Structure formats: C-alpha cells, structure tokens
From Swiss-Prot:
Record-level Gene Ontology MF annotations: chitin deacetylase activity; zinc ion binding
Gene of this entry: CDA8
Pfam families per the UniProt record, alphabetical: Polysacc_deac_1
Organism: Bombyx mori (Silk moth)
Binding site for Zn(2+): 63, 117, 121
Catalytic reactions on record: [(1->4)-N-acetyl-beta-D-glucosaminyl](n) + n H2O = chitosan + n acetate
Protein name per Swiss-Prot or TrEMBL: Chitin deacetylase 8
Cleaved signal peptide residues: 1-18
Glycosylated residues in this chain: 171
Length: 381
C-alpha cells in the first residue's frame, strides 16, 4: 500500500510538470541528427535516392485479440516471408477488454509486434482529446505493464502506441511515452503530406505535419518518434486514414477493383519518395468482406516477392530511419529474431469488473487475478 501511495505521488508530480514543457522551435537540420533526432520532412533519411531506398509496408490491426479474429490473422499472415527470406511483419495495437492474452503471446512468438491501444478504449472520443497526464499513465503507461504481465512477453518489446479513435491528446500522450520508454506513436494522420509522403520524425522541434484531429503536440519532447499515418485517397480523391474508413471505394464484392485500389495507393509511395506505406485496418473489415480479403492477400503476395519492398513490424521502420542503409545493404542484414516466450495459460473467471460490476472471463499467461484488470488496477489485484 505504501509503495502504491509513493507511486501515485510521483505520478501527480509528473502531471504537474506536464504544463512546463518548452515550446518546440523550428527544426535546424544541422543540429538535429540521426539516430536520436530527425526533423519532420518528406526527405528520404540518409539522403538516399528513392531507387536505393527500401519500401516498407506496415500492416496494422487495431483492438482486442480473441478466438474469432485470430483465425483471420492465422490465415492471411502466418508463414509469409519477404523476398530476403525474413518473416513478414505486422503490428497489433491491442486494447485490453475481452483480449485473450494467450493469443497475444502466440502472435508475439510468431514475430509480430504487439503495441498499445489503451486499457479501456472508452468513449466518448472527447475523453482522449482532453485526457490528463494521469489519465494516459493509467491507460497507456499501465497497459505496457499489464500487457507484459498477462501475455508473458518482455516489456522492452512493447514499443508502439495508437490512441483510440486516432484522437490526438496534444503533448500529453508523448510525454507519457517519453516517461514510460515507448518508442513511437502511430496515431497522427496526415492528409497534406502524402505525395511525397512524410517520413517518421522526432518531436525535439516543431512539426510540419498537418493537425487533422486536434490537439496535436506543440512542445519539444525528446524521445518518442512519430510514425505518420499517411492517408490513402479514395476513388473520389478524398483522404482516409484507415482502409475501412475510405468512403468512395469499389464495391465490397469487387475483388479486382479492390486489388487495383490497394495497388494504386501503394504506388503513390513506391513510385514516389518511398515513405512507409500503411495498410491500417480493423480485422472485421477483412473477415466480413471475402473479396477484399482476397484482394489483400493478392497484394501481399506481390509485395512479398519484390526485391525492394519489405512488409515489417512498425518498430522496424523506426530502427531503419535511425540508421538508414540502401536496399542492397538492408537485404544482407540478419533477420529479426524473437526469443520465444513461454505461456502457461490460465482460464480465469468469473472476475468482477469493479468499474461496472459485470462478470468477465479471460485467458492469460499467468496466475488468475482477484478482480478483472482495469484502469487504475491494471493487474486486477
């Protein structure tokens, strides 16, 4: 109890300090140097020519992992490799409620990236816009510990964040990321910097990125990287950040139309400055639309056989930007290796949610908690 009290006190102090962050100033490329600092820019890292630059593709899925959507992930992702014979990656931004942590462990052991998407994923969206430092410590900082504990994966492997509803929280979320040793955020869409696309950057200095869902950060916050969500363009040239958010699209039964739609958006990157191409989606959209699923699989089949395209975990993009090398050298690098993490599964329940008095069941890689884990009590103690 005493330890908890001390922790709460430290968090309150940190929250108070949150109002004293220095305002970001325009970026000086002579002073802001890799690997730890990069100005927001459409310039290719390392001054590489586009034809010498690896085209990274980041496939991401949001929300909880369960026995239903794991079947889609197994079907479309498992066993894929890039042309350099390294396993193809994908990133899962996982929210806590109804997540099966044994399956999170399975995805991690398959080499996919596990990232944070909040404990509660609560509504309304305005909560996230107005979230305090303390709110985001409990939703994001505590989720890192929760994820590591229940999924039996190293906390050091949890590097990314996506805030629910793509709702920016100003400086606050990035301050929490800096304080909890999180590497990058992939919440911030850009519709203005898509052709050429905006490359990842740090927040040491003022960002040039357009603020689509305010508030956006204005302070100088060394440490966290921004992995921009470069918007797609639908058939009427309207921007969309998530694939399932595009409005004017081919008919959902039109496999060929969707294949061409995906390829057109990909080529904007591939034939341009090769900024990372994101396929940001919710699993339900793939599983409930078989023609779109087939088009998606065809797209992955093509890029997995191109010598200059690499489907990777999102954190790997940041790693490359920190130390940019041309395609020929990148292809010679050793494949990433995930040290297997053992899951000793426990099926727990009914567990009472102290926030709503509902009964929950959960599968975890640890001993069962006394209560259903939630905001303010991430381990269910």
């Amino acid at each position: 109890m005493k330890r908890l009290s001390v922790l709460c006190s430290l968090l309150l102090v940190a929250a108070a300090l949150g109002t004293e962050l220095p305002l970001a100033t325009p970026c000086d490329e002579e002073a802001c140097k890799l690997p730890d600092c990069r100005c927001s820019s459409t310039n290719i890292p390392g001054g590489l020519r586009a034809r010498d630059t690896p085209q990274f593709v980041t496939v991401t899925f949001d929300d909880g992992i369960n026995v239903i959507n794991i079947e889609t992930y197994r079907e479309v992702l498992y066993g894929r490799s890039n042309s350099n014979r390294c396993p193809a990656g994908a990133t899962f931004y996982v929210s806590h409620e109804y997540t099966n942590y044994q399956l999170v462990n399975e995805l991690y052991n398959r080499g996919f990236e596990i990232a944070l998407h909040s404990i509660s994923h609560r509504t309304p969206q305005a909560f996230w816009a107005d979230a305090t430092y303390q709110n985001l410590v409990q939703e994001i900082g505590d989720q890192k510990r929760q994820m590591a504990h229940f999924a039996s994966i190293p906390a050091s492997a949890i590097k990314g964040v996506r805030i629910p509803f793509l709702q920016m929280s100003g400086n606050t979320s990035f301050q929490v990321m800096a304080d909890f040793d999180l590497l990058y955020d992939c919440t911030w869409p850009t519709t203005a910097l898509t052709n050429p696309g905006l490359w990842p950057y740090t927040l040491h200095h003022e960002s040039i990125q357009d603020c689509i869902i305010p508030p956006c950060p204005t302070a100088s916050i060394p440490g966290p990287w921004v992995l921009p969500m470069i918007s797609w363009r639908d058939l009427n040239n309207f921007p969309c950040s998530m694939v399932d958010g595009c409005f004017f699209t081919p008919d959902r039964t039109d496999e060929e139309g969707w294949f061409k739609f995906i390829l057109t958006n990909f080529e904007r990157h591939y034939l341009g400055n090769r900024a990372p191409f994101g396929f940001f989606v919710h699993e339900w959209f793939i599983s409930s639309n078989p023609a779109i699923k087939r088009a998606f699989v065809r797209f992955m089949d093509i890029i997995n056989n191109l010598n200059d395209v690499f489907m990777v975990n999102s954190a790997e993009v940041i790693d490359w930007v920190k130390n940019p090398v041309p395609i020929d050298r990148y292809r010679q690098q050793q494949c990433k290796f995930t040290m297997p993490s053992i899951c000793r599964p426990s099926f727990c329940g009914p567990l009472t949610g102290t926030h709503n008095q509902l009964s929950y069941y959960m599968t975890i890689c640890n001993t069962c908690p006394r209560n259903y884990p939630w905001v303010g009590n991430p381990l269910g103690q």
